[in-house]
Regions:
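Structural signature of hydrophobic alpha-helical transmembrane segments
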Residues: 1, 42-54, 152-165, 215-229, ...
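Alpha-helical transmembrane segments
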Residues: 47, 78-79, 153-164, 276-288, ...
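Juxtamembrane/interfacial segments at transmembrane-helix boundaries in multi-pass membrane proteins
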Residues: 84-175, 205-223, 271, 296-315, ...
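Predominantly late transmembrane helices and immediately cytosolic-facing juxtamembrane segments
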Residues: 172, 286-289, 356-391
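Hydrophobic residues within the alpha-helical transmembrane core of Major Facilitator Superfamily
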Residues: 4, 30, 80, 205, ...
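Alpha-helical multi-pass transmembrane bundles of energy-transducing inner-membrane proteins
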Residues: 17-141, 238-251, 257-305
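Central hydrophobic cores of alpha-helical transmembrane segments in multi-pass inner-membrane proteins
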Residues: 2-11, 28-30, 51-61, 160, ...
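Cytoplasmic/organellar membrane-interface segments at the starts of transmembrane helices
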Residues: 87, 91, 98, 315-317, ...
Length: 481
């Protein structure tokens, strides 16, 4: 869906090298689809790296005044992380191939390491081995050679995968390339970067890092969850300090994607489902914010909040659309953002993570509302103090058509989320099972349901937590471990 909308949103903003621009868009789409669909680790790496070139061109050729520096910083950051991942992929290839034919096939590698992960799970349960510094304190005779190798070198392989994906997310403190890239990128680059490309990082954790190294993921769980919460709070405070609208939206991505990582590393059914839902939410909401600001930038060629004020008087349709998307971004009940953040926070509170992390993440929701509503008030309301704003034209037909699909998704995903949750639940069940040291965990109670209020809810036997927006969340009893 995003590809045609990106073309529609950029229709009048790109007037140089138009053919090359669309070629770069198509190449980027191909690379992203290839990375998502790959069931071969080496092929995944090729597509994961191939994304860099067209995005580098989108920023470096069609970006703003500092586009070269932004493009180079983006390229170098992600390249360094990816090279470490390549080393880890080769290590996994040789490790999983012990005693059999070596392959980069996902299923072959996962199944090849499954037995070793089972051994490690039993060893850890019996406390005869450790996932700490690996000083040789475990009993080698109890483990197969593959399990010993995985226990000894697995943390470094997990770290290599995790660093590559953390840069792509991006997580604090390897996030510094993102604000500059977003600010300098054209509207198409920002939309694709926010809506899809950043999710390659969270997708990588979900599909590769945690399933291949469940014990190591548990070992790093406190660190990654802490960095996720730091990113949530840090991103919110950085947004409060911004005067550049596009940079504010960019830092909000750091905060929102922190919720995705927190839910993923809560290792609960609610957290996993909420994390996946939040990935979709961020793509819809932040992609729409960048697109709408791109429409405004085409008219004024200015990114500072102080250059606007009172434009709701001259652009009422644009204002209404922007406010709806803002409500989605701050997780107002009835919008898509509420479902994802609620499930993530619920999963975090039910997990074994320190309570302080869950409280800090919950507090940051208020900060998110503060910086977004502050920006809306500064830009759209008050007096028309700048003469240039009086002649601004409201959205045209093309721009309205490009925005309506985003608005529809915001409302449908917020009011009727069950059809998406039904799709996400099986993946969440598999993720929780694979995170349980590769063991066959009981995931029968991982299924998450959200029902519209009605007679059936009143008759339900389970207690329900009722929240605004005509939504009921049935209580979930499982720890999902």
């Amino acid at each position: 869906m995003l590809g045609p909308l990106v073309v529609l949103a950029s229709w009048s903003s790109i007037d140089e090298r138009v053919k090359e621009f669309h070629v770069a868009l198509l190449l980027l789409q191909t690379a992203m689809l290839g990375a998502i669909c790959s069931i071969d680790l080496l092929l995944f790496y090729v597509f994961f790296e191939a994304m860099l070139v067209p995005m580098y061109l989108l920023i470096g050729v069609w970006g703003s005044t500092e586009r070269q520096a932004a493009a180079m910083k983006f390229f170098l950051y992600t390249l360094v992380g990816s090279l470490l991942m390549l080393i880890a992929i080769l290590a996994v290839y040789f490790l999983a191939g012990q005693g059999g034919a070596r392959s980069f096939d996902y299923a072959s590698i996962y199944n090849g390491m499954l037995g070793a992960n089972h051994e490690i799970a039993q060893c850890l349960a019996a406390k005869t081995c450790d996932t700490g510094i690996f000083s040789g304190s475990f009993h080698n005779e109890q483990l197969s050679p593959m399990a010993v190798a995985l226990l000894r070198y697995g943390p470094w392989m997990f770290f290599a995968f995790a660093l590559a994906f953390a840069i792509k997310v991006p997580m604090f403190p390897v996030h510094t390339w993102l604000p500059l890239a977003h600010v300098q990128a054209p509207v198409a680059g920002s939309m694709i970067l926010a809506a899809v490309m950043l999710k390659m990082g969270t997708f990588g954790f979900w599909r590769f890092a945690v399933p291949f190294f469940p014990a190591m993921a548990r070992m790093y769980q406190p660190l990654i969850a802490t960095l996720a919460v730091i990113g949530i709070v840090y991103g919110a405070f950085m947004c409060l300090a911004q005067t550049d609208i596009k940079k504010l939206i960019a830092y909000s991505s750091v905060s929102h994607l922190g919720y995705c990582m927190l839910g993923m590393f809560a290792f609960t059914g609610e957290g996993a489902t909420g994390s996946a839902y939040q990935m979709l939410n961020h793509g819809v909401s932040t992609g729409a914010l960048f697109m709408l600001f791109g429409f405004l930038y085409e008219r004024r060629h200015d990114r500072l909040m102080s250059s606007f004020g009172g434009i709701a008087k001259v652009m009422p349709v644009f204002t209404a659309f922007f406010v709806i998307v803002t409500f989605s971004s701050i997780a107002v009940p009835g919008t898509n953002g509420f479902i994802g953040e609620f499930l993530v926070l619920l999963g975090s509170f039910k997990s074994n993570l320190p309570l302080a992390l869950s409280i800090a993440a919950t507090t940051a929701v208020v900060l998110g509302a503060a910086y977004m509503l502050w920006m809306v008030q500064k830009v759209f309301f008050g007096q028309l103090t700048h003469e240039a704003n009086r002649s601004l034209k409201d959205l045209g037909r093309r721009e309205v058509f490009a925005t309506l699909p985003f608005l529809a998704l915001i409302l449908v995903m917020g009011l009727k989320p069950q059809f998406i949750l039904d799709v996400l639940n099986p993946s969440s069940q598999k993720y929780i099972a694979r995170a349980a040291y590769g063991a066959d965990a009981d995931t029968s109670k991982v299924h998450i349901t959200v029902r519209t209020l009605g007679p059936a809810v009143a008759e339900a036997a389970q207690p329900h937590l009722l929240v605004p927006g005509a939504i009921a969340f049935p209580s979930l009893q499982a720890r999902d471990r």
